[in-house]
Amino acid sequence: LTAIYYKSRATLPDKVRATQQDGFLFGEISGQQIVLEHNHKFLVDFVEGQKTGFFLDQRENRKLLGEFANGKNVLNTFCYTGGFSVYALKAGARLVHSVDASEKAIDLTRKNIELNGFDAEQHACVATDTFDFLKGKENQYDLIILDPPAFAKH
């Protein structure tokens, strides 16, 4: 164990957020770190990344995708780190498109695709609004991952 970083402020109500401080409880790391999940490598920024930097609650869903992606055309919307894209490519997807409105997320997805040994022939990243991208895309994909961020606070 190298470090423990406490990060909860982004998900807390404003009144509670003002009393909390994100930071290291043990050790310290900086910048992007490589993590391994089911033999897949991912660059993760625990400090500056969205929420925890990598959504661990989706790890079994990413693994499950691998059972269905072989030979398929896959669209990963709101891709963030490209986790689902990496799993689809490793499973033998014919083609994977990753879409996110954030240039930073698209850059991270590209890095994670390269980190796992894939090239641009099998994968394309698109930095645009997912809903705009989906218009007019009927029957182009066999599998679509649609895991949007929260659009409204509770």
For each of these PLM feature ranges, what is it?
Residues S102-I145:
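S-adenosyl-L-methionine
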Residues L1-F54, K63:
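Non-catalytic substrate-recognition/targeting regions of SAM-dependent transferases
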Residues L56-K72:
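Conserved alpha-helix/loop element of class I SAM-dependent methyltransferases that forms part
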Residues G71-Y80:
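Conserved class I S-adenosyl-L-methionine
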Residues P148-P149:
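Switch II (G3) loop of P-loop NTPases
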